Amino acid sequence: MSSASPLARCCDEATPSAGPRAAQPPYHGPVTSMVAHDAAAGVTGEGAGPPVRRAPARTYQVRTYGCQMNVHDSERLAGLLEAAGYRRATDGSEADVVVFNTCAVRENADNRLYGNLSHLAPRKRANPDMQIAVGGCLAQKDRDAVLRRAPWVDVVFGTHNIGSLPTLLERARHNKVAQVEIAEALQQFPSSLPSSRESAYAAWVSISVGCNNSCTFCIVPSLRGREVDRSPADILAEVRSLVNDGVLEVTLLGQNVNAYGVSFADPALPRNRGAFAELLRACGDIDGLERVRFTSPHPAEFTDDVIEAMAQTRNVCPALHMPLQSGSDRILRAMRRSYRAERYLGIIERVRAAIPHAAITTDLIVGFPGETEEDFAATLDVVRRARFAAAFTFQYSKRPGTPAAQLDGQLPKAVVQERYERLIALQEQISLEANRALVGQAVEVLVATGEGRKDTVTARMSGRARDGRLVHFTAGQPRVRPGDVITTKVTEAAPHHLIADAGVLTHRRTRAGDAHTAGQPGRAVGLGMPGVGLPVSAAKPGGCR
């Protein structure tokens, strides 16, 4: 996967929320008084006299950096703001409130955030009523440092208290003083908050928050906290509700989904190491749910019961994203990755034995401190043997506060870049060979919007196959809509996508397509990313596994 891959660039680019979203049920959590909502909308109660002209509702924009966890949380931030009376800003307009949901995994995430904050400073000076809020992992890490570097910011909040955003914005407006509120522990599951979803046809469902691993390169556990699992009943209730709204595909999110069941928030629920496999099977019993994905598992805890559930559950997609990080056992030890290369390859072998057509993708880090040419050669060897459908490759980024930042042997940039390019070239050749093997085959595609960067030029539409591959196809008829399901035949292959110019073989209209036509958003949504291919905008894998 080249450096232009969505997962490699996700911390460099913010994904703004835009467009209308599905209505959500009333929210009764910690937000500003709903009187603000009524006043903003110009509504007066019975007996209040003649209608009084009110100021228009304040508009907002959420800019998202980083992983699927952040995309999920940003949908909750948008839902909270709309429940408090804010209105989503239209594309191209200047929002009254700009919220940055930040990433702290790589150094260029910091640089990009503070660069964008600097660009907003003139707007803030010209319009003091505009508000800027910074949340997410970088805010949790930097805390008061955000205001030192960007004193025009109005609100700083962390990963554990996103439900406080509307209250903090109102308090900052009233007191004319910046508000900083960083909670040290999870206050409530983000999934319990109102949501303004990014898609009519695909949804994120968080099954846990936090991580109990201690990878030396990763700062996420110190920012998200130790793992806390939602109850299966709550998760399945959310999935059923989404399906009732027309959603066809859900992605189950966790920093380490294999560990689900050992840290339930409800003390009445016993530890259950088989809980994740059971959850997958339970999703298979939900009528109308066509696709289930999950991200991401940890190789050290990947068990055969999960492989069996994947193979035997009708709607679990034949796709697995399992981070490798390095093919060198010596580097894996230095990373505190509690598995070795042969164990990883053994898991892949068992997955392919049970699901021969599974598309397996991974994450790789190049240039970890102390990595020798021999270590890097071991990574290349594992990549050749594993035959990944795609590999999302990152150059090691030194993060203050992580053990790896203190290690000797930090590599020169030129060495890391040269190895990175060699790895990219190898993986792209493997990806191309795998995709060429699909030419002539029929694929089922869940039609998306915005996944193809040149769709308007080529007159193609785009979507994802069941295995996550990106497919650009010629519809040949105007009735195909985002959210519909089609089958088509692959006519051409590239490393990052398939082309299907043979026309649509079958077309099934869906309620999700109806919802999209009725006014759902027209922006890019990764269908259970990480998938295989290059959508316009996508999120990187959730933290570090």
Curated annotation (Swiss-Prot):
Covalent S-S links between cysteines: none
Region (Disordered), start-end ranges: 1-32
Q: Which reaction does it catalyse?
A: N(6)-dimethylallyladenosine(37) in tRNA + (sulfur carrier)-SH + AH2 + 2 S-adenosyl-L-methionine = 2-methylsulfanyl-N(6)-dimethylallyladenosine(37) in tRNA + (sulfur carrier)-H + 5'-deoxyadenosine + L-methionine + A + S-adenosyl-L-homocysteine + 2 H(+)
Query: Which Pfam family, any one of them, does this sequence belong to?
Result: Radical_SAM
| Quaternary structure note | Monomer.
Job of this protein: Catalyzes the methylthiolation of N6-(dimethylallyl)adenosine (i(6)A), leading to the formation of 2-methylthio-N6-(dimethylallyl)adenosine (ms(2)i(6)A) at position 37 in tRNAs that read codons beginning with uridine.
Q: What's this protein's name?
A: tRNA-2-methylthio-N(6)-dimethylallyladenosine synthase
Q: Which organism is it from?
A: Mycobacterium tuberculosis (strain ATCC 25618 / H37Rv)
Phylogenetic classification of the source organism: Bacteria, Bacillati, Actinomycetota, Actinomycetes, Mycobacteriales
Q: Which gene encodes it?
A: miaB
